């Protein structure tokens, strides 16, 4: 139901809620800042009577732990994780890597790509290319 949520420095929280269907968030990503009329099912808040929130299990969901690590470290680390993740997911969808093997490749890519604390645009471009190359190399 919650597709995204952000908490601001003043403590306010904004969330994007919708049916458990990624078509609407993807449509918005492509049409931003405009809104396009769609025929997608609408979220009926009267039927959402019980939303529960739990502490994420980063031991069970290792990629989440890696994403948190990248977020807290900053610099070009989120770019490394994103690039490696895109490579492993594409490989997984073609049966080129196991589900559990994806985390290993992402973590090793994080270790092997040079960290840049304050990246410029060119650093991001180079980081993305290098992370993709290393992740693909680790898979093969």
Briefly describe each language-model feature range.
Residues 1-140:
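Catalytic, metal-anchored helix/loop core of enzyme active sites in primary metabolism
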